[in-house]
Amino acid sequence: MNDFTKNIAQALFNQDKINDLLRKELQQAVNDLLEAELTAFLGYNPYARDGWNTGNSRNGAYFRKVDTQFGKIEIQVPRDRNGLFHQHTLPDYKQHSDVLENMIIKLYSKGVTTREIADLIEKMYGSHYSPAQVSNISKQMIPKVEAYHKRKLSDKFFCVYLDATYVPLRRETFEREAVYIAIGIKPNGHKEVIDYCIAPNENIEVWTELLQSMKSRGLEQVELFLSDGVVGMKTALAKTYPQAHFQRCLVHVMRNICAKVRVEDREAIMNEFKQIHQQANKAAAVDVLHAFYAKWDKSYNHVIRNLKDIEPDLLVFYNYPKQIRASIYSTNMIESFNNVIKRKVKPKAEFPTEQSLDTFIGIQAMSYQ
């Protein structure tokens, strides 16, 4: 009679003891099977000399609790150094895996690196994911992002903000590339990222393609576009949305002015220029703007001359109700979204491919409210 048989015999009159005994035996058996599985995968026993210099080795284990009819058992799932071993003794715990994979995608969208996610998941849940596995899980979002780029758009938006931000991307060499972004507000006040695209730098040809794509997907009518001073934007808008009005971002205009004047004049110029968007009506704003011309023309003739050239685009927001003017004289709304992207991108240092960047931005865009 072996030890197991003796223990069973002693426990026969106590159901709890039998369950506890069977639970312990099952736990040991499963752990032995898992270790045998890894040995077969590696091709050598623990500490064996024939395992030297094979390119792979044992790398500890992670713990997993499994429900059985005899109670919970604690399993030590062995790991290999290269992260290639996948055990077949235990079935995948699908519900738990789904929770973890959703957590991985959420952490990825927050800008946490794949290595940090792998470490965090193991510490929190005792489940081992290599950085490569984390990256593969995040790739599950690729079809959703592709569908997002192709989705049917609403036919009307009251206002559309256009702006580009720069994100580090590797294409053989490391460069900062432009992410073109369009955020819209519908007549009911709902906000959404309409679409975005990635290109090496900002130019009007890419903006034109993005605008044409938006129209081809159903966006027929826009009341107002807001953008900075990228050359050719008004022309591109006139071709695609000829009925739309255009407001140049006053914050960008002010920054450009301050970059072209003396340091000692910047504070006064900035404070006076801000008065333009704080008036009760358009007529009062025109008076303030013309007073600004008169005061600074002698010192900065080239700046004032350029400002006069774009005057028709500076005060368009006054044509709309006072309650919404604060939201439509600048592209601050889209810049807030850009800042979120930059903050989340920072820990990643750079994106290895355009697709990885597209997926990351897509997750941000789809969760934008």
From Swiss-Prot:
Report the family membership: Belongs to the transposase mutator family.
User: From which source organism is this entry?
Assistant: Lactobacillus helveticus (Lactobacillus suntoryeus)
Q: Which GO terms describe its biological process?
A: DNA transposition
Q: What is this protein called?
A: Transposase for insertion sequence element IS1201
Q: Which GO terms describe its molecular function?
A: DNA binding; transposase activity
Superkingdom assignment: Bacteria
PANTHER family assigned to the protein according to its UniProt record, in alphabetical order: MUTATOR FAMILY TRANSPOSASE, TRANSPOSASE FOR INSERTION SEQUENCE ELEMENT IS1081
What are the UniProt keywords, alphabetically? DNA recombination, DNA-binding, Transposable element, Transposition
Its annotated function is as follows: Required for the transposition of the insertion element.
